[in-house]
């Protein structure tokens, strides 16, 4: 979005919703992990690779909280982390709240303290050369207001 604003393609961007990292454990939580404090004792903890967005955010949280964690595996995408946890191959992993929501009963969710400081932002803006800027603005208004319950149902945090 920053590039679109810089080159004049979009104006007045706004955050519509955010997506926060959560910890997931397999259904039934066989390793009995209750918090991120339990992770140093797990030999099967997975994260995304630091070079992809989910891994970058995870690294920021780890650095911010000064956590002493050592993932047994670093995956290229959130779906791989989620798959390892849901299948029981991993004791725990960090994924976006939307992915945890989509997994349903296959996983259990544990909040990561401080994760809300490091989110993915879902942005919206009217393009500078929109053919129908008023209608485009109306869509953004719906997405930032009336759509809040739908954002929540899907695991996002809507902006208030």
What are these model-derived regions, one by one?
Residues 1-7, 12-160:
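Exported/periplasmic ABC-transporter solute-binding proteins
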């Amino acid at each position: 979005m920053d590039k679109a604003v810089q080159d004049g393609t979009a104006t007045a961007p706004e955050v519509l919703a955010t997506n926060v990292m959560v910890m997931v454990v397999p259904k039934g939580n066989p390793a009995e992990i209750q918090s991120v404090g339990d992770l140093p004792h797990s030999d099967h903890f997975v994260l995304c690779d630091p070079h992809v967005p989910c891994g970058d955010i995870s690294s920021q949280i780890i650095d911010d909280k000064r956590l002493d964690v050592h993932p047994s595996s670093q995956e290229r995408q959130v779906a791989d982390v989620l798959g390892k946890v849901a299948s029981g191959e991993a004791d725990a992993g960090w994924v976006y709240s939307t992915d945890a929501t989509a997994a349903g009963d296959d996983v259990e969710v544990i909040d990561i303290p401080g994760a809300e400081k490091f989110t993915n932002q879902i942005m919206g803006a009217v393009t500078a050369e929109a053919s129908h800027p008023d209608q485009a603005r109306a869509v953004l208004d719906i997405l930032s207001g009336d759509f809040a319950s739908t954002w929540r149902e899907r695991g996002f945090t809507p902006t208030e």
